[in-house]
Curated annotation (Swiss-Prot):
Phylogenetic lineage: Eukaryota, Metazoa, Chordata, Craniata, Vertebrata
Protein name: Cyclic GMP-AMP synthase
Gene3D superfamilies: 1.10.1410.40, 3.30.460.90
Binding annotation for Mg(2+): E214, D216, D310
Free-text comment on the cofactor: Binds 1 Mg(2+) per subunit. Is also active with Mn(2+). Mn(2+)-activated enzyme forms an inverted pppGp(2'-5')A intermediate, suggesting a non-canonical but accelerated 2',3'-cGAMP cyclization without substrate flip-over. Mn(2+) ions are coordinated by triphosphate moiety of the inverted substrate, independent of the catalytic triad residues. Undergoes a liquid-like phase transition after binding to DNA, which is dependent on zinc.
Amino acid sequence: MAPPRRKATRKASETASGVSAPCVEGGLSAEPSEPAAVPEAPRPGARRCGAAGASGSRREKSRLDPREKPQVRARAARAEDQAEGPAAPTADAEPPAAPGHSLPRASTRSRGTASSARARRPQSGPPEGPGLGPRAPSPHLGRREEAPGAWKPRAVLEKLKLSRQEISVAAEVVNRLGDHLLRRLNSRESEFKGVDLLRTGSYYERVKISAPNEFDLMFTLEVPRIQLEEYCNSSAHYFVKFKRNPKGSPLDQFLEGGILSASKMLFKFRKIIKEEIKHIEDTDVIMERKKRGSPAVTLLIRKPREISVDIILALESKSSWPASTQKGLPISNWLGTKVKDNLKRQPFYLVPKHAKEGSLFQEETWRLSFSHIEKAILTNHGQTKTCCETEGVKCCRKECLKLMKYLLEQLKKKFGKQRGLDKFCSYHVKTAFLHVCTQNPHDSWWLYKDLELCFDNCVTYFLQCLKTEHLEHYFIPDVLSKQIEYEQNNGFPVFDEF
């Protein structure tokens, strides 16, 4: 039997009016620099990849098999100063799960030759994982002289503190909204009966800055006995099939040729929420216009103050994590092997984030998400169990992440699209931060008194990622290398996109 046709939609030439959904951390909404799913040479009997395969307008496939290309990056030796020893269990990065980051490029095409670009790439990081980009400087190597009139990070952090009163009001409104939607989705007539509510994102990770005005709520639906079919060797996007779907299942209506359609489920999910918010008392809430490619249904609470809430539908699978994550989550030297094993026994999630190929979207695909693992890591971030507890030593890890997020936020406000900063998302900063934590695992390297130096090290690492255009996804490390191979084999079409 011929494989089912896959729907494809062409990206609109103009964005729709209305407020765009904010970038959701943990990979749950469209990261501006998210690489497209990587096409591969057709194989006998393989499913045709990409929206183009469904519409008949196929993109040109890679001229060379990526497997014939030599290894671009060499594994770096462990730095001699890297201390070793058993790590105490403590509980990253959406994250979640999201495709790896090929960092955004500026609008100019004057980039030099491909060989010179490859020569600039740094060697890989620690042995765990295929490569983590540039080596982050270790705080214990020495302190820089403080410049006259140097900035005061603690004063900035004080300004970023959230008001307890604001937190209380915002949390009450958002929790009431979430509970109301949960009851409706679990009602007898709902196709989503059995969903659970998972609160994720920067607010619940306690790294929210400035104001409690953005929240993420993930509604998870367990789907037992599913089979994943990787989309175009992308490592992050998948078609979802049921190994055995009971007759009369409410999910039958979302099947298309045996594939669980992400677009159909998201459409129905959005429709239910749109109707239900009309019945929420004492809350002025509206739904924002759908953003192409985003898995989130964005609600705007207008009173008592404006709060943006991203509602995400996620499939929950308790099967083993996909093979593409095998070399990801490099936390053994930081949080310990036991913690890593425990985290990898947790479920993984799939969100209706469509794979993108050029200007086309494959609307039946789902994308991996690990936002719950990121939350667990940031909650228990110390190598010792008592790090940042009442009786323990306080570190400055979260403070560094807050400052990095604020730095990017302020630069985007100042320059916006003028310098291409709109292509960056706080998840890029978060991913870089997690790699610095991996390379500098010891709590003694993150003492609160060394905040200035630790933050400087984080910024230095991120700068190196920008200069080399290399930032590896924390959970799916091979995503970036596959995308680069595709670009190299096809004359770097990405240069024409900006």
